Amino acid sequence: MTQWRIDTPQSLDLEGVRRLNVRIVAGSIDVVGSTEATSTGGAHIEVSQLEGALTVTLEGDTLTIAHERLTWGGLLDWVGNMGNHKASAVVSVSVPDGCPVELGVVSADAVVSGITADTKVKSVSGSVTLDGVNADISAQTVSGDLETRHLEGQLRFTTVSGDLTVVDGSSSRVKAETVSGDITLDLDVAPGARLDLNSVSGDVTLRLPESASLQIEAKTMSGSLDSAFAGVTRDAKPGRSTLRGNVGSGDGLLQAKTVSGDVTILRRDSA
């Protein structure tokens, strides 16, 4: 194991990196997948702003960049003690695009792009953007928003009040759960896809191509339900409304449930 203590802005080049773990407080983190150093596992770290030391560790093929004493399981503990921890960082990291990423942020914004391996995200209050991540994603936030662009893979997302936005995505499996956050998906769905979308008071909006093939089951207690697809009908009763029907041959499944949030299913016409 090799370890460096970073207490001033600087850059660092490493080789043999096949996995990345990042945990920072405040500031921002930008992770970019590169195809240029795949064979050597080359990684480049650029720290441009810093308050509170960072520890950089290369153990085997795992690169870890973290504020001192900040653990993956202890992210929430920092929220109540932010005044006692003077820490922030602006960091950019380039790693091989096939490098799995585990990212934890507290009051920091994060961007991950060009990664083709599984990506795991935990955010307390920072916003997270995943661009061109062509692999499975697992994301958990408290109040942070998650936006994905050009998603190709399965997505699992849980939050209290953060919003989920998927733009220009393609997936066979999406599972999203929120309390008050909104869920907005613009998605191509693979044959046999399964989408499970649950919210208490947040709205669920889904735009599907007209060629989609899904069985639709949407329920709400007091929100509104609406679908742009023929063959999907609404049944409204006191305290419960449902939206059911098939789009195409119905070989996939969309289940959406809310308490007071609205559910809207839009159709994207062919060009």
Language model features: what each stretch is:
Residues 1-271:
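Intrinsically disordered, low-complexity terminal regions
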